[in-house]
C-alpha cells in the first residue's frame, strides 16, 4: 500500500505548482480564492513546516513519516498536515473534472456504499457536520472505502484511519468569498471539478 505522495521529500519542502490556472475552476471556485488559498495559505504552511524542521533530524524525514512520527509536535502536525492536505486537494481537481468515476474505483464505491449517489450524500454529510474548520475524506481502509472528517489540518494518515484518496477543504477561506456561509452549496459545486481519473490513480496506489 502506498499513498498519493509516497516519495520521500527531503532537503525542505516546496510549494507545488498547480497544473491549471487560478481561474480554471470557475465558476465553481473563483480565481481570487484559488490564488489566496494556494499562494498564501498553502505557501504559509510550506514555509512554516520548513522552519519547524530546520536544523533538526526531521529534515531527513518524508512528509508522511513526519505527520505520523511527530504527531505530538504541534508545528509539524499543523503545518505538515496543511502541506500534505492541500497537495492532495489541488491534485484531485481539474477544469475538466466532474462526472462519475469508472472502473475499479466505481466498483469499490458501489461495494462500500451501495451507489455513487449514496457515497456523495455521506461525504457531504461528513463535510457539513465537521464543526468549525477541517476536511472531509474518502479513504482506502482495509481494502474498502470509508468516509470521515478531521479537524483543522489533521488527516486520517496521522492516526492510521486510512489512506485519503480524495479530500475537500471546509475551512472558510476555501469558499467564503463565493458562497459566504453556504458550505453545502460549495461542496455541491466542488463535485463539478473533482478529477476522478486522479482519484482512481490514488485508489490503485492505496489498495
Language-model features: locations:
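Feature for soluble, non-membrane regions of globular proteins
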Residues: 2-207
Amino acid at each position: 500500500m502506498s499513498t498519493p505522495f509516497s516519495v520521500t521529500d527531503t532537503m525542505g519542502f516546496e510549494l507545488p505548482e498547480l497544473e491549471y490556472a487560478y481561474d480554471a475552476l470557475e465558476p465553481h471556485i473563483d480565481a481570487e480564492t484559488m490564488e489566496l488559498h494556494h499562494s498564501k495559505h498553502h505557501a504559509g504552511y510550506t514555509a512554516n513546516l520548513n522552519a519547524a524542521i530546520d536544523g533538526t533530524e526531521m529534515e531527513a524525514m518524508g512528509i508522511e513519516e513526519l505527520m505520523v512520527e511527530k504527531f505530538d509536535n504541534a508545528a509539524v502536525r499543523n503545518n505538515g498536515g496543511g502541506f500534505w492536505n492541500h497537495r492532495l486537494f489541488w491534485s484531485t481537481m481539474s477544469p475538466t473534472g466532474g462526472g462519475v468515476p469508472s472502473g475499479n474505483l466505481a466498483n469499490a464505491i458501489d461495494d462500500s456504499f451501495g451507489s455513487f449517489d449514496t457515497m456523495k450524500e455521506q461525504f457531504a454529510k461528513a463535510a457539513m457536520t465537521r464543526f468549525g474548520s477541517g476536511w472531509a475524506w474518502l479513504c482506502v481502509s482495509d481494502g474498502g472505502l470509508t468516509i470521515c472528517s478531521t479537524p483543522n489540518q489533521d488527516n486520517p494518515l496521522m492516526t492510521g484511519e486510512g489512506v485519503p484518496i480524495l479530500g475537500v477543504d471546509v475551512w472558510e477561506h476555501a469558499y467564503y468569498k463565493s458562497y459566504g456561509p453556504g458550505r453545502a452549496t460549495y461542496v455541491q459545486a466542488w463535485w463539478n471539478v473533482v478529477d476522478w481519473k486522479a482519484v482512481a490513480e490514488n485508489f490503485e496506489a492505496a489498495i
